[in-house]
UniProtKB/Swiss-Prot annotation:
The keyword Iron does not apply. A lipid is attached at residue 29 (N-palmitoyl cysteine). Its EC number is 2.3.2.-. Keywords: Acyltransferase, Cell membrane, Cell shape, Cell wall biogenesis/degradation, Glycoprotein, Lipoprotein, Membrane, Palmitate, Peptidoglycan synthesis, Secreted, Signal, Transferase. This is Putative L,D-transpeptidase LppS. It is a lipid-anchor.
Length: 403
C-alpha cells in the first residue's frame, strides 16, 4: 500500500512539475524550471528505493529457543511474494499457506523441538531475505490429562482437572496455556492441589445446561525447570440436572434431591464415632462408580493384623480420593439409621446402594454434616468445594508444594 501511494505521489509531482514548467515558460525564468525537474527526479528515485525492500521474516537470523508452537510469517514489502521455502536441517520442507493477495506467507504445521530451520523468501521485485533459527531444546517434556472426559454430562459440582505427567515449576505459564470457555459465562478460577495437579472451578455450583470447553495448549510452552509441554489436549462437557445428597449424622439418614425435589431418604451408617474413623464433614464430589470392587484397608494404612480388611463390595460410589464411598453393606443393615460402624464410608443396604449409584453421576454433590469428624480436606481430590472461594479466587500459582 505504501508503494501504491508513492507512485501516486510521483505522478502528482510530475503533473505539478509540468504546470510549473508551463508557468515559468511564460515568465521566461528557466532556472526555476531546472529546480523543478531535479525535484521530480529526486522523488522518482525515492519511490524506486522504497519499492526495493526485501520481504520481512517474523524471526531473526540466528534466533534460538524459538517457540515451536508459534507460526512463522513472511510479509512482502513490494508487489507480492514469488517464492518462499522453509526447510529443517534434514531438508524437509514445512507446509505453508499463502494469502489470497500473495503478500503474506505462514507456516501451516507445528514445528518440532530441537530443530534448525532455514527460510528463503523472494519478492516479485527480485529482493530476497534469508533467516536461520533453532527451536527450543527441552530437558524433558510432559503431557496433561484432562477431566471430565469429552462429551460427558456431569453434575453441578464438577471441577475441571489438569494432571501433568511431571511436576510443574512455572505454574503461571501452565495456567496461561489453558483456556476455559463457558456458555453462559461464569466466574471461575485456577487452584493447584499440588505441583502436578491443577483445578478450575466456578465461584458457585454450575447452572444445569451450561456448556464448557477446555483447551490446554501446552505444546511449545516452557513450564519451568527445563520441562516443556509435549502435546496439546482438549475436552468439553455439559452440566446436567442438579443432583445433591445430604447425609446427616444427626438423623443417620441420607436424602437425595434432583433439581430441588426429594427423591429418596435412606438410613445410613457413617464412620465410627472416633477421631480416627469418623466420616469427615463437608462437600464431596461424586467420582467413579463401581458396580463391584475390592475394598482393602491396607490402601490407607490399616494392616490386616490391626483389624484391617479386604472385602468385596457392591455398588461402590466414590466420594473422595482418600477412600470414602457410598456402598452396599448388608452386614451393617441393622446399624443403619441407628449407629455408626464403618471405617469412614457411608454404609447403606444393597438395594439403596444400587439405587443411589444409578441416581447420581460424576460431579454431583454429597454434603456430610453433624459427624464428630473434621472437614474433608480441600486437597483430597474430590473436596475442592471445601476451599472457600475467597481463598480459591486468589490462586496459588506463585507457590510450590513439597509434592
Amino acid at each position: 500500500m505504501r508503494v501504491f501511494r508513492g507512485r501516486r505521489g510521483a505522478v502528482a509531482g510530475s503533473f505539478l512539475a509540468v504546470l510549473a514548467i508551463g508557468s515559468l515558460a511564460l515568465t521566461g525564468c528557466t532556472i526555476e524550471r531546472s529546480d523543478a525537474q531535479e525535484q521530480s527526479s529526486q522523488q522518482s528515485t525515492e519511490v524506486e528505493a522504497e519499492e526495493a525492500q526485501a520481504p520481512v521474516i517474523s524471526v531473526d537470523d540466528g534466533d534460538e529457543d524459538v517457540d515451536p508452537s508459534e507460526s512463522v510469517i513472511v510479509k512482502s514489502m513490494g508487489d507480492g511474494l514469488s517464492k518462499v521455502t522453509m526447510t529443517n536441517e534434514e531438508g524437509y520442507e514445512v507446509e505453508s499457506e499463502l494469502s489470497d493477495d500473495g503478500r503474506s506467507w505462514t507456516t501451516a504445521e507445528t514445528l518440532g523441538y530441537n530443530r534448525t530451520y532455514t527460510i528463503k523468501a523472494t519478492d516479485k521485485n527480485g529482493e530476497t531475505a534469508t533467516a536461520s533459527f533453532s527451536t527450543a531444546t527441552p530437558a524433558a517434556t510432559t503431557n496433561v490429562a484432562l477431566s471430565p472426559l469429552a462429551d460427558s454430562v456431569v453434575g453441578v459440582g464438577q471441577t475441571i482437572g489438569f494432571r501433568f505427567g511431571s511436576p510443574v515449576k512455572d505454574r503461571k505459564a501452565a495456567q496461561d496455556a489453558i483456556t476455559v470457555t463457558t456458555s453462559p459465562k461464569v466466574e471461575g478460577g485456577f487452584y493447584w492441589l499440588n505441583n502436578s495437579e491443577l483445578r478450575w472451578r466456578p465461584a458457585e455450583y454450575w447452572e444445569p445446561g451450561t456448556e464448557v470447553t477446555v483447551e490446554a495448549d501446552i505444546y511449545g510452552k516452557d513450564l519451568g525447570g527445563g520441562v516443556w509441554g509435549e502435546t496439546d489436549n482438549a475436552t468439553n462437557f455439559t452440566i446436567g440436572d442438579k443432583v445433591e445428597a445430604v447425609a446427616d449424622d444427626a438423623t443417620k439418614t441420607m436424602s437425595v434431591y434432583k433439581n430441588g425435589e426429594l427423591l429418596r431418604t435412606m438410613p445410613v451408617s457413617f464412620g465410627r464415632d472416633t477421631s480416627e474413623w469418623a466420616t469427615p464433614n463437608g462437600t464431596y464430589i461424586i467420582g467413579d462408580r463401581n458396580e463391584s470392587m475390592i475394598m482393602d484397608s491396607t490402601t490407607f494404612g490399616l494392616g490386616y493384623e490391626e483389624g484391617g480388611y479386604r472385602t468385596p463390595v457392591k455398588y461402590a460410589t466414590q466420594m473422595s480420593y482418600s477412600g470414602i464411598y457410598v456402598h452396599a453393606a448388608p452386614w451393617s443393615v441393622g446399624a443403619q439409621g441407628s449407629y455408626n460402624t464403618s471405617h469412614g464410608c457411608i454404609n447403606v443396604s444393597t438395594e439403596n446402594a444400587q439405587w443411589f449409584q444409578e441416581a447420581v453421576k460424576r460431579g454431583d454433590i454429597v454434603t456430610v454434616k453433624n459427624t464428630i469428624g473434621e472437614t474433608l480436606s480441600g486437597y483430597d481430590g474430590l473436596g475442592d468445594w471445601n476451599i472457600p472461594w475467597s481463598e480459591w479466587s486468589k490462586g496459588n500459582a506463585d507457590q510450590t508444594s513439597a509434592w
